[in-house]
């Protein structure tokens, strides 16, 4: 009996499954009673429960008289991947998966249990020997400081060999295209795939269980769609996939995709990741710095584009100008423009400043779009939310991609990670952070001169400290960033916050449950710093907040109706922010006027105070 103890072994939750099996004359053994400690598990399996289940599964696989009943519950994130690994390990040996929820009927469990037991008995009687698969997939190996690619026929290539190509799925158009351009500048044959569409989603769903999170389904669909559209390819194709060390399911994407490649027997195809373990794919310091610059510029340019969509007199002409600037930046990252980045950005600012505006960018309403990093940035995953808000006069500030890189630095420097670093590594990482901050400040300072971008440095520490009373910083992941950013930005720059995440994403649901309670004046006040102007908003009660999950399908009409109500509430808050701002500006002006009047008329205290400050 496999599964999580709280729903597999608890009689109130398991629908009497152990009793149903035992009453038919079969022994039921909980998996944690098996002596399976000596089995090895994949190093990528970072969930403790997953390690125990996979070890016990190997024990069951070796015993002819043991069969697996896997009890899970609806929308269990880790099980969406563990079930795939479990079935792959069992191979042709039958097993039964029972997914329980509040609608599960007793009769349905009886029927499936009887059918499974009949199949298992037949399997034992037939004594089926599984066929041996002779497929050999390509793979990426780390040879010291060099990355090598081994094709399906055993030939070895370097990463820069013309016979090797790296394909990047769309993870936000600007970010993906810029990273691909930087890889090409290194001599690597890199290609950025276009933004996913409905066909991509369907391809992904056909080759997954559809229970995995949306980013994995879309990226898998993108890869398989590319392979099927290029049947005559003669290169080893490496599919770039982000990874992590848990608890988020992101760290399982690469292993699950490798299983898809093996199952579909796709020759000369492998998964490529960049981590500190493989020296970031052999990228040198200069290319890593370029990647950081590209991510910062991508984040800023997305904000500028949204501002112009609301403020420009001619929206189409303005967005065309942004597109031309972006193509020049891509040429720079590819190494085809021999000009300094600061000069190129200054030229871009001059062109952006010349765009005619019908509204003052500093007075337009701003909505913060936060949540899971892939979904909030990917144009297909978030559907038409950004366009809908812009058409209603709202600038949409999407939480930056660079924020998560800064969070990774924070985790390392705060000692929240499991790995221990040597003194030299710590010094090197501190230098890297200082260089990153210098370039972030430099790029944002230049782009803010256009008047279309508001300068603000990423401060992850401030975000986390502000919500330390809600989430412990040891609970790593995007939940703490989502909660912190929502409460920081509301009433500061934003008149409303939208949190978006994949369907069934645990960090997104944790953040949503907290924000639904805390997105009010009392919650904002609990995280506010001294000197905040929260007293001007006390009559607002609840603050505009809207959370939604996406599975790639079009949003239902109920979501659209809720968005309309959210927009009305956000517009009222924006008007209150403008009133407070105008009142503050006039009060400051009066204070300055009186101050100078005192100085001119010879007021002794005022004059002595000025002399003291001058000294």
Short names for language-model regions:
Residues 1-615:
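An N-terminal assembly and electron-transfer interface module characteristic of large anaerobic redox
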């Amino acid at each position: 009996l496999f599964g999580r103890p709280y729903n597999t072994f608890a009689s109130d939750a398991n629908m009497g499954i152990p009793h149903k099996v035992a009453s038919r004359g079969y022994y039921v053994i909980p998996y944690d009673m098996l002596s399976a400690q000596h089995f090895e598990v994949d190093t990528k399996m970072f969930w403790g429960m997953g390690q125990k289940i996979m070890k016990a599964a190997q024990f069951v696989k070796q015993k002819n008289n043991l069969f697996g009943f896997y009890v899970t519950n609806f929308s269990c994130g880790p099980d969406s991947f563990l079930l795939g690994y479990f079935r792959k390990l069992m191979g042709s040996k039958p097993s039964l998966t029972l997914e329980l929820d509040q609608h599960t009927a007793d009769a349905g469990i009886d029927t499936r249990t009887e059918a499974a037991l009949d199949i298992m008995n037949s399997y034992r009687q037939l004594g089926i020997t599984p066929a041996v698969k002779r497929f050999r997939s390509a793979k990426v190996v780390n040879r010291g400081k060099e990355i090598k690619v081994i094709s399906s026929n055993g030939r070895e290539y370097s990463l820069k060999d013309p016979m090797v190509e790296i394909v990047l799925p769309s993870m936000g158009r600007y970010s993906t295209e810029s990273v691909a351009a930087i890889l090409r500048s290194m001599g690597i044959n890199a290609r950025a795939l276009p933004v996913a569409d409905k066909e991509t989603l369907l391809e992904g769903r056909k080759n997954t269980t559809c229970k995995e999170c949306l980013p994995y389904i879309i990226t898998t669909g993108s890869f398989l769609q590319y392979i099927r559209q290029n049947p005559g390819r003669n290169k080893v194709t490496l599919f770039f996939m982000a990874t992590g060390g848990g608890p988020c399911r992101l760290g399982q994407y690469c292993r699950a995709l490798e299983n898809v490649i093996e199952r579909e027997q796709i020759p000369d195809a492998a998964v490529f990741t960049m981590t500190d373990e493989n020296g970031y794919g052999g990228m040198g310091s200069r290319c890593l710095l370029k990647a950081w610059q590209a991510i910062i510029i991508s984040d800023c340019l997305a904000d500028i584009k949204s501002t112009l969509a609301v403020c420009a007199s001619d929206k189409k002409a303005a967005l065309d100008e942004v597109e031309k600037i972006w193509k020049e930046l891509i040429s720079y990252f590819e190494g085809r423009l021999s000009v300094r980045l600061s000069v190129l950005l200054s030229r871009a600012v001059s062109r952006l400043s010349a765009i005619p505006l019908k509204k003052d960018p500093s007075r337009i309403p701003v909505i913060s779009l936060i949540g899971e990093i892939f979904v909030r940035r990917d144009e297909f995953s978030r559907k038409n939310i950004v366009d809908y808000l812009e058409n209603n006069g709202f600038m949409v500030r999407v939480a930056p991609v660079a924020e998560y890189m800064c969070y990774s630095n924070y985790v390392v420097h705060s000692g929240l990670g499991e790995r221990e670093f040597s003194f030299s590594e710590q010094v090197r990482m501190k230098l890297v952070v200082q260089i990153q901050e210098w370039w972030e400040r430099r790029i944002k300072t230049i782009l803010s001169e256009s008047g279309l971008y508001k300068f603000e440095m990423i401060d992850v520490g401030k975000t986390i400290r502000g919500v330390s009373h809600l989430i412990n910083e040891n609970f790593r992941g995007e939940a703490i960033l989502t909660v912190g950013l929502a409460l920081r930005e509301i009433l500061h720059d934003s008149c409303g916050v939208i949190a978006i995440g994949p369907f069934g994403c645990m960090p997104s649901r944790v953040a949503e449950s907290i924000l639904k309670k805390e997105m009010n004046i009392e919650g904002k006040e609990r995280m506010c710093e001294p000197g905040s102007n929260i007293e001007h908003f006390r009559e607002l009660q609840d603050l505009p907040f809207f959370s939604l999950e996406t599975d790639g399908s079009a949003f239902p009409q109920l979501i659209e109706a809720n968005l309309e109500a959210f927009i009305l509430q956000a517009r009222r808050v924006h008007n209150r922010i403008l009133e407070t701002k105008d009142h503050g500006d006039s009060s400051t002006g009066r204070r300055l006027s009186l101050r100078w009047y005192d100085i001119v008329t010879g007021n002794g205290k005022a004059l002595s105070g000025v002399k003291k400050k001058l000294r």
